[in-house]
Amino acid sequence: MYGIENQTKVEKRMPARISGYEGASYRGQYDKKTIVPVITMVLYYGTDRKWTAPKNLKSLIKVPDNLDKYVNDTKANVFEIAWLTDEQIAKFTSDYKIVANFFVNKRKNKDYIPDDKTTIKHVDEILKFLSVMTGDSRYEEILSDKEGVSNMCDVAQRLEDRGIEKGLQKGREEGNQMIYSLVEDE
């Protein structure tokens, strides 16, 4: 059984959280004939710094030396997505390759404009995911008119088109405001 924890910020008590999740999963299997292992992975999408928090439970608590061997030490399996190498990204064969590439490039350049020409198989899911993980609602806004979106270049074009349209609208509003104020002054 796998658990996936998506993080955009470093969580200093992640091993304790994982211990709770895994404990609940094992408890849920208590009455089953066979208990299967529970593996929790933390997918960290932070682009400003690497994961700096403890990755095991014993790093969070003070355990007297004489009790150390009796205390379980839950480990946080943290994967720093924005820090993957090109070789690691190349191993992905699903849409996740597009996601990983996006965050690596966002880390390298905060003003990164998506330029990945890889075809997106699950457009809804990718755009919703990017919206949530980046806090940028424009990705989800593209969903209302996703026709013709097949790769990240299309997404970038839609973002640019929306930005241009908003700029034109704002320019029209400011122009109208200026005309009204000139007319009122006469």
Region roles according to the model:
Residues 1-166:
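A general recognition-element feature
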Residues 169-186:
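Assembly-interface segments of oligomeric complexes
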